[in-house]
Amino acid sequence: MSGQSPVNPARKLHDADVVYLYDGSFEGFLCCVFESFAQHELPFAIWTPERETATLYPVKEIPTDHAKARRVFASFRAKLGEETESLVTRDFLSGWEDKELRLIRFLHLAFALGSGTVKRRGHPEVAPLYQMKQSLDWEVDKFQGFVRFQEHDGMLGAVIHPKNYILPLLRGHFCARFPEENFLIYDVVHQAVLLYQNHKAQLLELAEPLTLPPPDEKEQQFQELWRQFYKTLEIKARRNEKGRMTHCPKRFWADMTEMKEELK
């Protein structure tokens, strides 16, 4: 394929009884895209090592090749436009189990029909991408308001349990919000940390779970003050449990200082 575009939809696409296995990185996913277009096949499934399970289908390991990944990524903007490039890149952060297959199906359609494909929101191969984006945007909006920090030896630390991998999307907000602080946000679900220290931010993948130290006495006092403040704001006669659940779903409560006690 040295003299060809990395994505060439000219030949007829076929469903293949094969499972792609890749390393879970975005570059690795781009190599899955390359393989799918090179073989003109839609795999039965696309797995990462964490999602690998027993199957009767042959498993094809897709190694991460940085040169191939760059070629595929460059073709997104060159042939499909910036909007498609942004949507695919953002949706890769989704927590949907079949996100890779959804994205590849869309890309085959987009390269066949052109840059306007992303506008066809009602198309069955396009609609799921906007559903993934909506889920991402909703979680980002919620966590921008629901992240609760505790001080640990001069550093602020927070724990979150998002369904989607949203740390890259939270980075700009919290770095701008606390430019002079050192802080970390620990994503338990995806075993990753957003670390901001000495005015520099980095995303770290963890090899094993992280345990934050317990808050000291001063921090515990501040937390108790915050809980008391939250309680004094409530007007019991106007309590609307359904409305509260809508604006602050229960799955967020375990990581929120003022809500933890209500889970007991």
Language-model features: locations:
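N-terminal ordered "arm"
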Residues: S2-H66
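Acidic, Ser/Thr-rich peripheral helices and adjacent loops at domain boundaries
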Residues: P63-V72, K200-L212
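Short coil/turn segments at secondary-structure boundaries
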Residues: L87-D91, V188, R239-M245
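Internal, well-folded beta-alpha domain core
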Residues: G116-L206
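Charged, alpha-helical interface segments at or near domain boundaries
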Residues: W47-D141
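Conserved aromatic-histidine-acidic binding/catalytic patches
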Residues: V18-S25, K60, P124, M155-I166, ...
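Long, compositionally biased intrinsically disordered terminal regions
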Residues: E180-N182, A192-N198, L210-K264
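Short, hydrophobic/amphipathic alpha-helical patches that form generic packing surfaces
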Residues: G28-Q39, R105-A112, G172-A176, E224-K231
